[in-house]
Each structure stands twice: as C-alpha cells, then as structure tokens.
Amino acid sequence: MKARIYLFLAAAVVLAVALPVANAQSAQSGNYTVRTVALPDHGKGTIAMDYIAYDPKTGYVWAPGINIGSVYVVDTSDDSVREISDFPTNEVELGGRKRVQGPSGVSIGDGVVYIGDRADSSICAVDEKTLVRKSCGHIDSTPDGVVYVASTKEVWVTAPRDNSVRILDSGSLAQKEKLTFEGRPEGYAVDAKRGRLYMNYEDKDLTTAIDLKTRKTLAKWPSSCGEDGPHGISVDQQTGFLFVACSTRAEVLDAGHNGEKLSSIDTGDGVDDLAYSPATHTLYVGAARAAQLTVAHVDDKGKLTLIAQVPTHEGARNGVVTKNEMVYLAHSQLGKLPGLIVASPTKR
C-alpha cells in the first residue's frame, strides 16, 4: 500500500434551514455549521463508505473508501488528508446491481488501526502514525464489522453471510475462534466494564450481550426496530445505556440491567449507525435518506431529548464524534459525494 498526502480546503457552509420539527427545536439547527472535507476520488465522482473511526490519541478520522480501494486519514485539527492506496477491490452483483467491494471496516487498536476488506476477506493492521501496513490475516467469509477488544487483545470480525463472528489474535491476525449465531450479526459495541460485546441480529430484530471471555450469549433483548431490524450500536459504559440504530430512529436499552427499552427518538430515514459522546451525554445520529443529523441529550434515566436536527447531505450517515464534539459523517451509496460531511457546534 502507498501513502499519499493531500491538503484540501474544506468548504464551510452554514445551514440554518429549519426542518419539520417543533419551532424551538428547528431554530437550534443554526447552532451547527456543516462543511465537506474533499477526498481524492480518482475520477470516480463519488466515494462509498460504511464504517469510519476516530482515534482520540492522534485526532485522526479513518475512512475506508470502498469503491476506491483506499483508506483516507483526516487530521481533524486542519482537515488535511492522507491516502493509503492499493487495497484490493472487486466488482460483485448485489440485489441485481453491480458494486465495487473493497476496504470497509475499521477499528482503532493499540498503536495500529485494523482495516477489513470485503474484496479479499482480509483484515490488515496499519501503523496509526506512519500509515505503513504491518500485517494481514484472512478469514473464509466476507468481513463486515471489525472491532478491537483491548482486554483480550483480540480483533472480533462480524461475518453476516454465515451468521458468524471470527476472533483474531490482535498481533498475528490469525483466527483463534469462530462463533456461530442464530441471527445475522450487525453492529458492535465493547463494554469493558462489564466484559461484554453487544451485537444485533439484524434479521431477528434482537440485540444481544456476549461474554468476552466465555464467548457465551448472556442475554437477548427485543430491539423493536421492525422489519428492517437493528443496525449499529453504541454503549455508555458508566450507565449501561445501550443505543441501538433503527432505520428511522434511535432507541435506548438498559443493558446494565434487564435490557428494558427506556426511550427512543425519530431521526428520519436512512440510519445505519450512531455515535455517542459519554463526556457530554450526547447522541449523534446521521440519516442518509433524510439528509440530516439528529443531536439528542441522554439524561440519567436514559431519556432522549432532541437538541437539534441539522441539514447535512444525501447519503450522510455513520458518524464519529471528536473530542471537540465535531461530527464526521461517512457518505453511503446515496447521492454523489467524494468526501466526508462535518457538523461542528457553533461557538457562542
């Protein structure tokens, strides 16, 4: 893989357009500015992404470009971009449409960042500072989510095609174990405090808790997302609140106790994942079809209260939140955009 350095000027656009919510809430959309961070698309006209990740140690956002075969590393201090190229890609037919598959999963590890590639079913470790690839492993199914588990020094990889999770050694990236489930794995959240990994069964409308050491499923809770099932997931380790992404809303489950549903909030259509800031107890949910970012506060009882709904861009979803509460949103297959969308709170 080759690393290239690019420097783009991010186009900053203030969006104060009111969305169809209550007047007091709509007015608060003006408390955010939205800009685009341009990424090199090599003539493709758009960049398709799934997972992105934020590394608080370096301040970098890592964004795999599936159809480009590159991983973009954005310095959030100045939006400068470095590109790691030459990841494998291939063209496959999905639902009667041809799509390019390539690097899509990403997780921040200990000094390295793990990249999952759907084209060759590889998981590679890349140095978080030099951006040099260190080692790669392969599994015999298409990887989706990739997550580093610090307490066990493992990388867990969801493989929805065969309803499995593959557990890799974080150093060698050799597969240690294969866990098979009754549903299609989707999303992940590590709860180090309770020694659990939370995961959804997208086709069963269930959210599960798995013991990181024994690998046993400890609990299954109704996600109540409906026909589309649950997608992404995040956890507040202090409170035990689990945030579940449904296609048109976000829900809070009490995973610290019995998995009871505590609250939900409408977000607009096109939600795939969500981001949570434990420092401010704020949930951020990008909706790709609705082209908006929902910002909500979570109180000590798990109740969600709307702060703002911010107009973004068609396809903007799967956000990560930085230490400064800036939200970087990935771009999906919807619409055309060669870049990331960034929503920043306006300084008062």
Positions of PLM-derived features:
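Bacterial N-terminal signal peptides that target proteins for export
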Residues: 1-9
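Predominantly soluble domains enriched in secretory-pathway, periplasmic, or organellar proteins
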Residues: 12, 21-348
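Bacterial N-terminal signal peptides
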Residues: 8-18
